[in-house]
């Protein structure tokens, strides 16, 4: 399911001549396995999540947005933890690059092309490997 959305995103961007696409990433149940503990951030990555996120960080055509309901102090801890693995995000819970336009109002719901979130059906145990294979096919020209 997620690979179809990503493939469609790449095809659409190519047809439209977009220089960038916007991907939103949840933390719990998506990048990291949830630990269900208060005052202790999750630290167990799903298989292939680190490799994929590092690949995405090398691409200038993908803007990475951290999409999380974590508390601000937890977000800081997650950003520090991710940074140890070379995983960085361009924005947190916002996309200031896409302003309101003829197609949508983006002040209350930010714009993205791809959403990776367990609540949207993302399966951290299987989807990262599928994304890894897909990204190897969609290299930057």
Task: Describe each region flagged by the PLM.
Residues 1-141:
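HAD-like aspartate-dependent phosphatase fold
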